[in-house]
């Protein structure tokens, strides 16, 4: 069934290198043919994505744990976004990698439903935690006095995770272990109505991509307007302070200059965090746009080239978003990784120094014991010589 194949593609459920015998044929009519060359490319791409996502996000979490500013609100959101990216790596990329290696799903029906459920949980969590971080930056810039407190931040993150768990529930009912050929079982999606794949893929696209992108665009539109307005006010205040009337004002002019400079410093710090979240959002859009474009094309166009290699590889590149985020953190918060490297070097130096001290003390003990033995033997010889004479 065309709808079943499209649904499997949409969430990386079925081995993407499987080419169906016919677009209009039933999926249970015969086992799909396997494109071995394409499967090897998929395995290589997924291995690279998995390595980058695991290593990068693990370093971010370790750096956030060792930093002195671990209670920062921005770092709090970064931590949960890194956790979501690790969920994508472990429960979305890794199962798909194993699937491409084995070609078939080997496991019970419960494991099939659980894997498909967790794959979409990571997708929702990564998207909506990024949206929450952007809303926090919008409040910090537009309404700094009414920005969320830390306890509210925790509740918002908890509500986001719970919402993602609930929104992913349809996966449990759509996917199951089914017989796709005589004696051949696979984790497959089945829709009761023929319009089911179109409705489901469209809903996923709206919930994970289109609606978040609209909200993100609104957030950064407000942020850009507020920053532009703030720059205008600071420019006007600086011009007024440098005017002759401001110079004649004495202490008042100096106080105005002090206020302007302090506001400028605070704005630079906030603008830097806004730049970081904006680049993360841009990476999100770049990575997910081809994926959802191909998804919508596959279910709304019966003549879509579902067997084309480029069409299938694009399905895998959405997970690149989980690899990009750690490098963006490193670019804008380099002190985190600098502190992590320094901590690692200090621990390594302390370990090596401890080993050297241990070796030195051992050698001193051996030298002192040999000196005592030689001293005792010489004294014994001096005492024994008169008796023999």
From Swiss-Prot:
Family: Belongs to the G-protein coupled receptor 1 family. Vasopressin/oxytocin receptor subfamily.
Name of this chain's protein: Oxytocin receptor
Keyword Hydrolase attached: no
Chain spans, region Disordered: 1-27, 358-389
Coiled coil, from the record: none
Residue stretches spanning the membrane: 39-63, 75-97, 114-135, 155-175, 203-225, 276-294, 310-332
Biological function: Receptor for oxytocin. The activity of this receptor is mediated by G proteins which activate a phosphatidylinositol-calcium second messenger system.
InterPro entries, per the entry: GPCR_Rhodpsn (IPR000276), GPCR_Rhodpsn_7TM (IPR017452), Oxytocn_rcpt (IPR002062), Vasoprsn_rcpt (IPR001817)
UniProt GO molecular function: oxytocin receptor activity; vasopressin receptor activity
Annotated membrane topology: Multi-pass membrane protein
Main location per the UniProt record: membrane
GO BP term, pick one: G protein-coupled receptor signaling pathway
Entry-linked PANTHER family: NEUROPEPTIDE RECEPTOR-RELATED G-PROTEIN COUPLED RECEPTOR (PTHR24241), OXYTOCIN RECEPTOR (PTHR24241:SF89)
Keywords: Cell membrane, Disulfide bond, G-protein coupled receptor, Glycoprotein, Membrane, Phosphoprotein, Receptor, Transducer, Transmembrane, Transmembrane helix
Annotated Polar residues bias: 8-18
Source species: Macaca mulatta
């Amino acid at each position: 069934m065309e709808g079943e194949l499209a649904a499997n593609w949409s969430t990386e459920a079925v081995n993407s290198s499987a080419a169906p015998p016919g677009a209009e044929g039933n999926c249970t009519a015969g086992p799909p043919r396997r494109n071995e060359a394409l499967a090897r490319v998929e395995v290589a791409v997924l291995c690279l994505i998995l390595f980058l996502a695991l290593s990068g996000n693990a370093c971010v979490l370790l750096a956030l744990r060792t930093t002195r500013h671990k209670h920062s609100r921005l770092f709090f959101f970064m931590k949960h976004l890194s956790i979501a990216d690790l969920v994508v790596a472990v429960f979305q990329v890794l199962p798909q990698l194993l699937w491409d290696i084995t070609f078939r799903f080997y496991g019970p029906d419960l494991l099939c439903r659980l894997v498909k459920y967790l794959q979409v949980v990571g997708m929702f969590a990564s998207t909506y935690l990024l949206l929450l971080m952007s809303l926090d930056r919008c409040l910090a810039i537009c309404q700094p006095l009414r920005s969320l407190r830390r306890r509210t931040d925790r509740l918002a993150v908890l509500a986001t995770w719970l919402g993602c768990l609930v929104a992913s529930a349809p996966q449990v009912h759509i996917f199951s272990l089914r017989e796709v050929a005589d004696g051949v079982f696979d984790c497959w999606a089945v829709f009761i109505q023929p319009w089911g794949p179109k409705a489901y893929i469209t809903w996923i696209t709206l919930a994970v991509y289109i609606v978040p992108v609209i909200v993100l665009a609104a957030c950064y539109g407000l942020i850009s307007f507020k920053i532009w307005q703030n720059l205008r006010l600071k420019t006007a205040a600086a011009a007024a302070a440098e005017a002759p009337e401001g110079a004649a004002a004495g202490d008042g002019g100096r106080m105005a200059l002090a206020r302007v400079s302090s506001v400028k410093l605070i704005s630079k710090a906030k603008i830097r965090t806004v730049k970081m979240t904006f680049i993360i959002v841009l990476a999100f859009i770049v990575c997910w746009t081809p994926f959802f474009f191909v998804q919508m094309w596959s279910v709304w166009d019966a003549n879509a080239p579902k067997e084309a290699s480029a069409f299938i590889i694009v399905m895998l590149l959405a997970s690149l978003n989980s690899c990009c985020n750690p490098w963006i953190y490193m670019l804008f918060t380099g002190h985190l990784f600098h502190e992590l490297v320094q901590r690692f070097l200090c621990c390594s130096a302390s370990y090596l120094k401890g080993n050297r001290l241990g070796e030195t003390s051992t050698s001193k003990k051996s030298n002192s014991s040999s000196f005592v033995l030689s001293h005792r033997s010489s004294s014994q010889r001096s005492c024994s010589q008169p008796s023999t004479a």
